[in-house]
């Protein structure tokens, strides 16, 4: 029997896919457990804000245990990333347990603030005064921590970490959008479809194209025709910046509302200046998106560590001295790549958002197109992860000889 099981051994990709499906089942089940009935929710016309929340696994159409999604977790990752960016050596020396505790404690604090904001903005005033608000906050925080735990487990034993949860949330949001009669000419509709297709091709270009910086490899003496190069993606941060930027924007809005409400109880919940119906709100979001895209890309590239690796191995760039000169050269190249990639993604997301200010009657269709773009971008990253595991399965018979 043991021999039969070894003969038909499941590949690692199948095991991980099965685990991810189990995580998604729990997530879908949790989103259907409502804390407050739909009739007690406030009707908000800011549709893109709801769509933005769904891009992080949340849902504010109904108040369920997973309403906050991964917003507090992603926001805590942003804060810790920006703090550690100034001293990468100290960050690399931290144990995984230290990083885990810092991340979870900060997530817990942010989820309390986010819960307070969501309850006051999306639940009717009568229901807020009737119910125990602290108990509702406790339920939301508990659900958020559970979802973070599921995403963390999926990172270890599943596929692509939080990406599948976000993808299911986006699909659910797209299915619940009500498409009304489009009051536009066929030329305008055709133009929108063409722009979406062009955007998808640009995103595919960003993911597939990489920048190659050739260097001299001292160990490469046998194959003189084979050049060694350092490769970076055009957008090293990938699709995670789209979720992080929305998370940071949501936290900024909820944080400002939380602070102002402490001094003025009659403060407006809508805060029209920080919505996607306002050019100021869109501009603030795009600035956050661009800055986070740049800093996260620089964080992942880690030119300081790369220059140390070159110094240890003896490899060097033509015309560049080892050590500090190599680090300055890599920083120069990294700035060019990271700013270009971050700016390109920001422009792709920003054009349709500003377009909704000029043609508000097409805002639902444009938001749907933005969600479709984000969905394809995330799908590309998930497909890249699956391809990596397939490579592992391909070489598994060879690797098993040494394990």
Curated annotation (Swiss-Prot):
Pfam families: SecY (PF00344)
GO BP field: intracellular protein transmembrane transport; protein targeting
Keyword Transmembrane helix: yes
Bilayer topology annotation: Multi-pass membrane protein
Gene Ontology cellular component list: plasma membrane
Subunit details: Component of the accessory SecA2/SecY2 protein translocase complex required to export cell wall proteins. May form heterotrimers with SecE and SecG subunits.
Family named by the database record: Belongs to the SecY/SEC61-alpha family. SecY2 subfamily.
Main location: membrane
Entry protein name: Accessory Sec system protein translocase subunit SecY2
Chain segments annotated as transmembrane: 17-37, 63-83, 105-125, 131-151, 157-177, 186-206, 240-260, 276-296, 339-359, 366-386
Function of the protein: Part of the accessory SecA2/SecY2 system specifically required for export of possible cell wall proteins. The central subunit of a protein translocation channel.
InterPro entries the UniProt entry points to: SecY/SEC61-alpha, SecY2, SecY_dom_sf
Gene3D superfamilies assigned to the protein according to its UniProt record, in alphabetical order: SecY subunit domain
Statement: the UniProt record of this protein carries the keyword Membrane: yes
Annotated source species: Staphylococcus aureus (strain N315)
Keywords: Cell membrane, Membrane, Protein transport, Translocation, Transmembrane, Transmembrane helix, Transport
Cellular compartment(s): Cell membrane
Gene name linked to the record: secY2
């Amino acid at each position: 029997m043991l021999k039969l099981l070894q003969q038909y051994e499941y590949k690692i990709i199948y095991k991980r896919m099965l685990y991810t499906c189990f995580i998604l089942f729990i997530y879908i089940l949790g989103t259907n457990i409502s804390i407050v009935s739909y009739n007690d929710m406030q009707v908000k016309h800011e549709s893109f804000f709801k769509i933005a929340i769904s891009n992080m696994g949340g849902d504010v159409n109904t108040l369920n245990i997973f309403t906050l999604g991964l917003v507090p977790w992603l926001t805590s990752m942003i804060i810790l990333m920006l703090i550690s960016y100034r001293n990468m050596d100290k960050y690399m020396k931290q144990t995984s347990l230290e990083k885990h505790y810092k991340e979870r404690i900060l997530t817990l604090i942010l989820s309390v603030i986010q819960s307070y904001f969501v309850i006051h903005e999306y639940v009717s005033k009568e229901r807020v005064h009737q119910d125990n608000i602290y108990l509702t906050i406790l339920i939301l925080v508990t659900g958020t921590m559970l979802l973070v735990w599921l995403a963390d487990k999926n990172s270890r034993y599943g596929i692509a970490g939080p990406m599948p949860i976000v993808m299911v949330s986006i699909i659910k949001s797209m299915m619940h959008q009500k498409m009304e009669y489009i009051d536009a000419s066929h030329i305008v509709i055709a133009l929108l479809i063409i722009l979406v297709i062009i955007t998808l091709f640009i995103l595919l270009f960003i993911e597939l194209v990489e920048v190659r910086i050739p260097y001299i490899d001292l160990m490469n003496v046998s194959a003189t025709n084979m050049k060694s190069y350092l490769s970076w993606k055009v957008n090293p941060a990938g699709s995670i910046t789209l979720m992080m930027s929305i998370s940071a924007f949501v936290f900024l809005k909820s944080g400002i509302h939380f602070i102002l409400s402490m001094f003025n109880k009659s403060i407006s919940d809508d805060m029209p200046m920080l919505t996607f119906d306002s050019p100021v709100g869109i501009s603030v979001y795009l600035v956050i998106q661009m800055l986070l895209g740049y800093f996260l890309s620089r964080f992942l590239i880690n030119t300081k560590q790369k220059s140390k690796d070159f110094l240890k191995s003896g490899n060097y760039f033509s015309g560049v001295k080892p050590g500090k000169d190599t680090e300055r050269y890599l920083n120069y190249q990294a700035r060019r790549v990271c700013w270009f990639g971050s700016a390109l993604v920001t422009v792709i997301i920003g054009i349709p958002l500003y377009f909704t200010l000029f043609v508000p009657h097409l805002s639902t269709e444009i938001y749907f197109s933005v969600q479709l773009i984000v969905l394809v971008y995330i799908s590309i990253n998930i497909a890249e992860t699956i391809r990596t595991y397939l490579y592992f399965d391909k070489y598994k018979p060879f690797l098993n000889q040494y394990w």
